[in-house]
Protein backbone atom coordinates (compact mmCIF):
# COMPACT_ATOMS: atom_id res chain seq x y z
CA UNK A 1 0.00 0.00 0.00
CA UNK A 2 1.20 3.51 -0.85
CA UNK A 3 0.04 6.14 1.61
CA UNK A 4 -0.77 9.67 0.52
CA UNK A 5 1.50 12.20 2.21
CA UNK A 6 0.44 15.85 2.43
CA UNK A 7 1.86 18.11 -0.25
CA UNK A 8 5.02 20.07 0.48
CA UNK A 9 5.84 18.27 3.73
CA UNK A 10 9.50 19.00 3.06
CA UNK A 11 11.08 22.38 3.67
CA UNK A 12 14.01 21.50 1.42
CA UNK A 13 14.63 22.79 -2.08
CA UNK A 14 12.87 20.66 -4.72
CA UNK A 15 14.99 18.43 -6.90
CA UNK A 16 16.28 20.16 -10.03
CA UNK A 17 17.72 18.97 -13.33
CA UNK A 18 21.18 19.87 -12.04
CA UNK A 19 20.70 17.43 -9.15
CA UNK A 20 19.80 14.62 -11.53
CA UNK A 21 22.83 15.31 -13.72
CA UNK A 22 25.13 15.50 -10.70
CA UNK A 23 23.86 12.21 -9.30
CA UNK A 24 24.05 10.49 -12.67
CA UNK A 25 27.71 11.42 -12.85
CA UNK A 26 28.33 10.03 -9.38
CA UNK A 27 26.51 6.82 -10.28
CA UNK A 28 28.86 6.32 -13.22
CA UNK A 29 31.96 7.00 -11.09
CA UNK A 30 30.82 4.70 -8.29
CA UNK A 31 30.46 1.87 -10.77
CA UNK A 32 34.28 1.77 -10.68
CA UNK A 33 34.52 2.29 -6.91
CA UNK A 34 32.60 -0.61 -5.42
CA UNK A 35 34.53 -0.40 -2.14
CA UNK A 36 33.42 3.15 -1.34
CA UNK A 37 32.03 3.36 2.20
CA UNK A 38 30.08 6.53 3.04
CA UNK A 39 30.27 8.03 6.53
CA UNK A 40 27.06 10.10 6.68
CA UNK A 41 25.69 11.94 9.70
CA UNK A 42 21.98 11.72 10.46
CA UNK A 43 20.02 14.18 12.61
CA UNK A 44 17.13 12.44 14.36
CA UNK A 45 14.18 13.53 16.48
CA UNK A 46 10.55 14.57 16.45
CA UNK A 47 9.12 17.60 14.73
CA UNK A 48 9.70 20.97 16.45
CA UNK A 49 12.33 19.53 18.78
CA UNK A 50 15.29 21.51 17.43
CA UNK A 51 16.48 19.18 14.66
CA UNK A 52 16.26 22.02 12.16
CA UNK A 53 18.29 24.28 14.42
CA UNK A 54 21.01 21.66 14.91
CA UNK A 55 21.27 21.22 11.14
CA UNK A 56 21.44 24.99 10.63
CA UNK A 57 24.21 25.22 13.22
CA UNK A 58 26.26 22.58 11.40
CA UNK A 59 25.45 23.69 7.85
CA UNK A 60 28.15 26.42 7.61
CA UNK A 61 30.94 24.07 8.73
CA UNK A 62 33.57 23.72 6.03
CA UNK A 63 33.87 19.95 6.52
CA UNK A 64 30.17 19.21 6.07
CA UNK A 65 27.68 19.16 3.21
CA UNK A 66 24.22 19.51 4.72
CA UNK A 67 20.85 18.42 3.34
CA UNK A 68 17.78 19.66 5.21
CA UNK A 69 14.52 17.86 4.42
CA UNK A 70 15.54 17.45 0.80
CA UNK A 71 13.03 15.80 -1.54
CA UNK A 72 12.65 13.00 -2.40
CA UNK A 73 14.72 11.78 0.56
CA UNK A 74 12.53 13.40 3.19
CA UNK A 75 9.34 12.08 1.58
CA UNK A 76 10.68 8.52 1.48
CA UNK A 77 11.88 8.67 5.07
CA UNK A 78 8.58 10.07 6.32
CA UNK A 79 6.50 7.47 4.50
CA UNK A 80 8.60 4.62 5.91
CA UNK A 81 8.44 6.11 9.40
CA UNK A 82 4.65 6.15 9.20
CA UNK A 83 4.25 2.83 7.41
CA UNK A 84 6.97 0.19 7.93
CA UNK A 85 5.49 -1.92 5.13
CA UNK A 86 6.81 0.72 2.73
CA UNK A 87 10.41 -0.17 3.60
CA UNK A 88 10.67 -3.00 1.08
CA UNK A 89 9.64 -0.59 -1.66
CA UNK A 90 11.49 2.57 -0.62
CA UNK A 91 14.53 1.58 1.45
CA UNK A 92 16.67 0.44 -1.53
CA UNK A 93 16.09 3.80 -3.24
CA UNK A 94 16.91 5.69 -0.04
CA UNK A 95 20.16 3.82 0.54
CA UNK A 96 21.27 4.29 -3.06
CA UNK A 97 20.47 7.98 -2.86
CA UNK A 98 22.43 8.43 0.37
CA UNK A 99 25.42 6.67 -1.18
CA UNK A 100 25.28 8.96 -4.21
CA UNK A 101 24.79 12.11 -2.11
CA UNK A 102 27.69 11.17 0.16
CA UNK A 103 29.96 10.51 -2.81
CA UNK A 104 28.91 13.76 -4.44
CA UNK A 105 29.68 15.67 -1.22
CA UNK A 106 33.33 14.53 -1.14
CA UNK A 107 35.70 15.73 0.23
CA UNK A 108 33.07 17.01 2.63
CA UNK A 109 31.03 14.69 4.83
CA UNK A 110 27.30 14.34 4.18
CA UNK A 111 24.92 15.43 6.93
CA UNK A 112 21.21 14.78 6.41
CA UNK A 113 18.39 16.25 8.48
CA UNK A 114 15.45 13.99 7.73
CA UNK A 115 14.44 13.61 11.35
CA UNK A 116 11.94 10.73 10.91
CA UNK A 117 15.04 8.60 10.27
CA UNK A 118 14.80 8.04 14.01
CA UNK A 119 12.58 5.08 13.04
CA UNK A 120 15.04 3.75 10.44
CA UNK A 121 18.31 4.27 12.29
CA UNK A 122 19.24 0.61 12.84
CA UNK A 123 19.03 -0.12 9.11
CA UNK A 124 21.07 2.96 8.27
CA UNK A 125 23.65 1.99 10.87
CA UNK A 126 23.91 -1.51 9.45
CA UNK A 127 24.37 -0.38 5.84
CA UNK A 128 26.68 2.52 6.73
CA UNK A 129 29.02 1.26 9.48
CA UNK A 130 30.83 4.61 9.66
CA UNK A 131 27.62 6.62 10.07
CA UNK A 132 27.00 8.79 13.12
CA UNK A 133 23.69 9.85 14.61
CA UNK A 134 22.65 13.04 16.41
CA UNK A 135 19.49 12.58 18.48
CA UNK A 136 17.81 15.86 19.42
CA UNK A 137 15.52 16.22 22.43
CA UNK A 138 13.47 19.22 23.54
CA UNK A 139 11.21 19.46 26.58
CA UNK A 140 7.67 18.26 25.98
CA UNK A 141 5.99 21.60 26.65
CA UNK A 142 8.19 23.55 24.24
CA UNK A 143 7.83 20.83 21.61
CA UNK A 144 4.05 20.64 21.88
CA UNK A 145 3.58 24.42 21.91
CA UNK A 146 5.72 24.75 18.78
CA UNK A 147 3.88 21.84 17.14
CA UNK A 148 0.52 23.52 17.69
CA UNK A 149 1.80 26.73 16.07
CA UNK A 150 3.19 24.91 13.03
CA UNK A 151 0.49 23.99 10.52
CA UNK A 152 2.50 21.23 8.86
CA UNK A 153 3.35 19.50 12.15
CA UNK A 154 -0.14 20.01 13.58
CA UNK A 155 -1.53 18.34 10.46
CA UNK A 156 -0.37 14.91 11.60
CA UNK A 157 -2.29 15.07 14.87
CA UNK A 158 -5.36 16.45 13.11
CA UNK A 159 -5.37 13.80 10.37
CA UNK A 160 -3.95 10.79 12.20
CA UNK A 161 -6.83 8.52 11.12
CA UNK A 162 -5.84 8.92 7.45
CA UNK A 163 -2.81 6.71 8.14
CA UNK A 164 -2.23 3.11 9.20
CA UNK A 165 -2.46 2.09 12.84
CA UNK A 166 -0.21 1.18 14.57
CA UNK A 167 1.66 4.37 13.73
CA UNK A 168 5.04 4.63 15.43
CA UNK A 169 5.59 8.10 13.93
CA UNK A 170 2.65 9.47 15.95
CA UNK A 171 2.77 7.03 18.86
CA UNK A 172 -0.64 5.54 18.04
CA UNK A 173 -1.12 1.85 18.80
CA UNK A 174 -4.07 -0.52 18.70
CA UNK A 175 -4.13 -0.29 22.49
CA UNK A 176 -4.33 3.51 22.75
CA UNK A 177 -6.23 4.17 19.52
CA UNK A 178 -9.64 4.80 21.09
CA UNK A 179 -8.20 7.04 23.80
CA UNK A 180 -6.10 8.91 21.24
CA UNK A 181 -9.18 9.63 19.13
CA UNK A 182 -10.72 11.47 22.09
CA UNK A 183 -7.61 13.50 22.95
CA UNK A 184 -7.03 17.18 22.33
CA UNK A 185 -4.39 18.20 19.80
CA UNK A 186 -2.02 19.11 22.62
CA UNK A 187 -2.34 15.65 24.14
CA UNK A 188 -1.85 13.96 20.75
CA UNK A 189 1.33 15.97 20.19
CA UNK A 190 2.48 14.84 23.64
CA UNK A 191 1.88 11.21 22.65
CA UNK A 192 4.14 11.74 19.65
CA UNK A 193 6.83 13.38 21.82
CA UNK A 194 6.76 10.49 24.29
CA UNK A 195 7.08 7.90 21.51
CA UNK A 196 10.16 9.70 20.19
CA UNK A 197 11.67 10.06 23.66
CA UNK A 198 11.41 6.33 24.25
CA UNK A 199 12.78 5.67 20.78
CA UNK A 200 15.86 7.81 21.56
CA UNK A 201 16.35 5.73 24.71
CA UNK A 202 16.11 2.57 22.62
CA UNK A 203 18.57 3.83 20.01
CA UNK A 204 21.14 4.81 22.61
CA UNK A 205 21.23 1.17 23.71
CA UNK A 206 21.44 -0.05 20.11
CA UNK A 207 23.87 2.47 18.61
CA UNK A 208 26.08 3.07 21.64
CA UNK A 209 28.88 5.53 20.97
CA UNK A 210 27.71 6.04 17.39
CA UNK A 211 24.95 8.33 18.69
CA UNK A 212 25.01 11.54 20.68
CA UNK A 213 21.99 13.08 22.37
CA UNK A 214 21.75 16.86 22.10
CA UNK A 215 19.33 18.60 24.45
CA UNK A 216 17.73 21.73 23.09
CA UNK A 217 17.84 23.67 26.34
CA UNK A 218 21.50 22.81 26.96
CA UNK A 219 22.43 23.90 23.45
CA UNK A 220 20.74 27.20 24.31
CA UNK A 221 22.20 27.70 27.79
CA UNK A 222 25.55 25.86 27.58
CA UNK A 223 26.30 26.58 23.95
CA UNK A 224 30.11 26.46 23.99
CA UNK A 225 30.19 23.23 25.97
CA UNK A 226 27.64 21.53 23.73
CA UNK A 227 29.29 22.67 20.50
CA UNK A 228 32.61 21.30 21.71
CA UNK A 229 30.96 18.03 22.66
CA UNK A 230 29.40 17.81 19.20
CA UNK A 231 32.67 18.75 17.49
CA UNK A 232 34.48 16.00 19.39
CA UNK A 233 31.79 13.44 18.58
CA UNK A 234 31.93 14.23 14.85
CA UNK A 235 35.75 14.40 14.90
CA UNK A 236 35.77 17.82 13.26
CA UNK A 237 39.12 19.58 13.15
CA UNK A 238 37.62 23.06 13.03
CA UNK A 239 35.24 24.46 15.67
CA UNK A 240 31.53 24.60 14.93
CA UNK A 241 30.45 28.20 14.20
CA UNK A 242 28.58 29.98 16.97
CA UNK A 243 24.83 30.06 16.30
CA UNK A 244 22.35 32.81 17.01
CA UNK A 245 20.73 32.09 20.36
CA UNK A 246 17.03 32.84 20.81
CA UNK A 247 16.69 32.06 24.49
CA UNK A 248 13.11 33.33 24.64
CA UNK A 249 12.08 30.10 22.90
CA UNK A 250 12.83 28.21 26.12
CA UNK A 251 10.00 29.88 28.02
CA UNK A 252 7.58 30.77 25.24
CA UNK A 253 5.43 27.72 25.93
CA UNK A 254 4.35 29.23 29.25
CA UNK A 255 2.57 31.96 27.29
CA UNK A 256 1.34 29.76 24.46
CA UNK A 257 -0.13 26.84 26.41
CA UNK A 258 -3.20 27.12 28.60
CA UNK A 259 -3.32 25.52 32.03
CA UNK A 260 -5.71 22.94 30.62
CA UNK A 261 -3.29 22.05 27.83
CA UNK A 262 -0.42 21.76 30.31
CA UNK A 263 -2.53 19.42 32.44
CA UNK A 264 -3.43 17.33 29.38
CA UNK A 265 0.23 17.03 28.43
CA UNK A 266 1.20 16.00 31.95
CA UNK A 267 -1.55 13.38 31.97
CA UNK A 268 -0.06 11.82 28.83
CA UNK A 269 3.64 11.83 29.65
CA UNK A 270 3.67 11.55 33.45
CA UNK A 271 7.16 11.59 34.93
CA UNK A 272 8.67 11.83 31.44
CA UNK A 273 7.71 15.53 31.56
CA UNK A 274 10.87 16.07 33.60
CA UNK A 275 13.06 14.73 30.82
CA UNK A 276 14.51 17.00 28.20
Descriptions of predicted regions:
Residues 127-148:
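Conserved phosphate-donor/acceptor-positioning beta-strand/loop module used by diverse small-molecule
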Residues 81, 87-97, 107-124, 151-191, ...:
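Anion-recognition interface
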Residues 52-55, 74-76, 118-121, 141-146, ...:
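Short catalytic/ligand-binding loop motif for oxyanion handling, primarily in non-cytosolic enzymes
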Residues 61, 128, 208:
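Acidic-histidine catalytic/liganding microenvironments
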Residues 64, 131, 210-211:
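Short, conserved active-site loop motifs that form the nucleotide-linked donor/cofactor pocket
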Residues 1-40, 156-157, 165-276:
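PAPS-dependent sulfotransferases, especially Golgi type II membrane carbohydrate sulfotransferases
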Residues 43-45, 110-113, 135-137, 213-216:
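Short beta-strand segments
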Residues 1-105, 152-153:
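PAPS-dependent sulfotransferase catalytic core
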Amino acid sequence: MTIQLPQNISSGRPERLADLIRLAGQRARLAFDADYQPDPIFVLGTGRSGTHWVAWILEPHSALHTLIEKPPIFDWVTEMAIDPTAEDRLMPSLLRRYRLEAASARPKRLLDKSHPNIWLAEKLAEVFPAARFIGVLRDVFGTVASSLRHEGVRYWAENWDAYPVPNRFLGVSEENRDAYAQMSLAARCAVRWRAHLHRLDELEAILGDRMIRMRYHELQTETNRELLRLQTFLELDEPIPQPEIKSDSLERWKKDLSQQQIAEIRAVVGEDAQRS
